[in-house]
Swiss-Prot record:
GO CC list: cytoplasm
Transmembrane helix among keywords: no
InterPro entries on file: Pept_tRNA_hydro, Pept_tRNA_hydro_CS, Pept_tRNA_hydro_sf
Catalyses which reaction(s): an N-acyl-L-alpha-aminoacyl-tRNA + H2O = an N-acyl-L-amino acid + a tRNA + H(+)
Name the record gives this protein: Peptidyl-tRNA hydrolase
PROSITE patterns: PEPT_TRNA_HYDROL_1
Binding positions (tRNA): 14, 64, 66, 112
Residues flagged as site, Discriminates between blocked and unblocked aminoacyl-tRNA: 9
Annotated positions for site Stabilizes the basic form of H active site to accept a proton: 91
Its biological purpose: Hydrolyzes ribosome-free peptidyl-tRNAs (with 1 or more amino acids incorporated), which drop off the ribosome during protein synthesis, or as a result of ribosome stalling. Catalyzes the release of premature peptidyl moieties from peptidyl-tRNA molecules trapped in stalled 50S ribosomal subunits, and thus maintains levels of free tRNAs and 50S ribosomes.
Keyword terms of this UniProt record: Cytoplasm, Hydrolase, RNA-binding, tRNA-binding
One GO molecular-function entry: tRNA binding
Group of enzyme by EC: hydrolase
Length: 185
């Protein structure tokens, strides 16, 4: 069984903001595959589906970004999903807008959602699909991550969401992190 989690903040106020890139990428995948997050439990919206013969949980934690680990750990523990079978999709300010990078483990890179997941799972050995939103140029970090993409930026993000769909499918098919890194980084 696989767990694919998109990170973001719940509520209309945060819809389409840069910090909700994980939600947007997962929503793109779900929409393209006619799937819905139809359950509300484990402090998140989720669904369990069979994709390419594999049982997959798709999850959007509703705990706010900084506590994302609570929801992910609850799902992983309940369904007995190993950390290496988890893929977390999130924004990354250290990469240009729309750039994608896969990581198999490592540090949080200052991302509070990833810090929370590490603390709650007790390991950093889970997969990440990072999508760049770049550092702010003039505005504060908070203002930047909580603002929407402009039209030009959104085109880059839409292209990234298309690539992320392929990455998610390859992950579900059992392609390991090394393969994904070689293919997409």
């Amino acid at each position: 069984m696989k767990l694919i989690a998109g990170l973001g903040n719940p509520g209309k106020k945060y819809d389409q903001t840069k910090h909700n890139t994980g939600f947007m990428a997962l929503d793109h995948y779900l929409s393209k595959n006619n799937l819905d997050l139809d359950k509300d439990k484990f402090e998140g919206l989720w669904t369990k589906q069979k994709v390419n013969g594999e049982d997959v949980i798709f999850l959007e934690p509703q705990t706010f970004m900084n506590d994302s680990g609570k929801s992910i750990a609850q799902v992983a523990n309940f369904f007995k999903i190993a950390p290496e079978d988890i893929l977390v999709i999130h924004d990354d300010m250290d990469m240009p807008i729309g750039k994608i990078r896969i990581r198999a483990n490592g540090k949080s890179g200052g991302h509070n959602g990833i810090k929370s997941i590490m603390a709650c799972l007790g390991t950093n050995n889970f997969n990440r699909l990072k999508i760049g939103i770049r550092h702010p140029q003039k505005e504060s970090v908070v203002s930047w991550v909580l603002s929407p993409f402009n039209d030009e930026q959104q085109k880059l993000m839409d292209a990234a969401f298309e690539v992320s769909e392929n990455i998610i499918n390859d992950f579900i098919k059992g392609k390991n992190a090394q393969y994904l890194m070689n293919q997409y980084n």
